[in-house]
Amino acid sequence: DHRCRIVWRFVESLDLEPFYETIQVTDSKAGRSSIAPEILISLWLMATLDGISSAREINRRCKTDLIYMWICGGVSVNYHTISDFRCDHVEKLNDILTSSVASLIKQGFVTLAEIGQDGMRVRAAAGSSSFRRKPTLDELHKHAKAHVEALEEERRRQDESNDDDDDPPSRTRREAAADRAAREREQRIARAIEESEKLRDKKRKDKEKVRTSTTDPDARRMKMGDGGTRPAVNVQFASDSDARVIVGVEVSGDGTDGGKLPPMLDQIEDRYGIIPERALVDSAYATQASVQQAESVGCAVVSTVPRSEQLRRHGKDPHQRQRRDNDEYEAFRKRMAEAEYQELYKKRPSVAELPNADCRNRGLTQLRIRGLTKATAVALWHALTFNLLRMVHMGAIA
């Protein structure tokens, strides 16, 4: 079987009732038929498998590629519908991830006794030059707001001059697009000012140096894998240690992984009602606050001890209690001195980094959309695609 048939069988097994609830087309009324969600979901899963992130490219393949034509089954689609569907159903995609993993738990493929978590920084759809300081943002917002008001006044005068005409001309697409672009720019700059205030409140010093992007206010400058600093978002995946299936997804504007483990444990409990017994993470996650929160809910953190080499250079044992350690962190240090847990930690790359590497290979390197909500939707499409391949490997899909 071609993998497009596997994709279709997987989609057929899903509960898509929430997608159908939003469709308002009926047989008794005139109008264009709505496109079945099975088609649009299959198109995006197939495109993600092929490393395609462009809605226009998918639309082109629906007309020229037999695989995509087979998925459409003679139904006409356009790039706008495909593009909107990618990001308009974040909650429903989250539900699909939850229900599909819950099914694997029921079948015994996934236990969630042990998870791995790792993050990757994905280039945002914003330029480095779009980051501005607060005074500049205020000035830009004033000009953008004045521009919107000027356009509204111009449209009002046009409407008044056309009142006496028997057949007044309707607003052109170009005028409507100009109005929409002006409003969206004003809204983005306003969001950038809000984000700038939040960042300034968090910083203890150099508050005046805080910059936010007018293109994507949710993007942050982050240090990337090649050593460069670029606008990006932080995509976090948590995966089951046995099945290597993604069980949790989070997207944020934080440039570090510190503090990301407790929210992921909460997410897993909310999704499946299970708290993992162990979490395999690198030392960036093993902050004292994170270890304390994880241990308090019954999850043992398995990681290298932060600053081990520095402590050894000063003649200290990193696996013994240090000044300012709490009881949970002392237990973590002593646990990681045991050979059993050091051997267990060696599994971390194959558990935590495998999903990241696979998604990178399928194009999760540069976002085409803006905002954390839409970025979460893209991350969920990649998670569902990765899990689909794992299900095929495990024999969970016939």
Residue ranges, per PLM feature:
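Generic anion/oxyanion-binding catalytic loop in active/binding sites
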Residues: 47, 71, 250
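Helical catalytic core of nucleic-acid polymerases
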Residues: 17-19, 26-32, 37, 61-74, ...
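Basic, short loop/linker segments at the boundary and entry of helix-turn-helix/winged-helix-like folds
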Residues: 1-45, 50
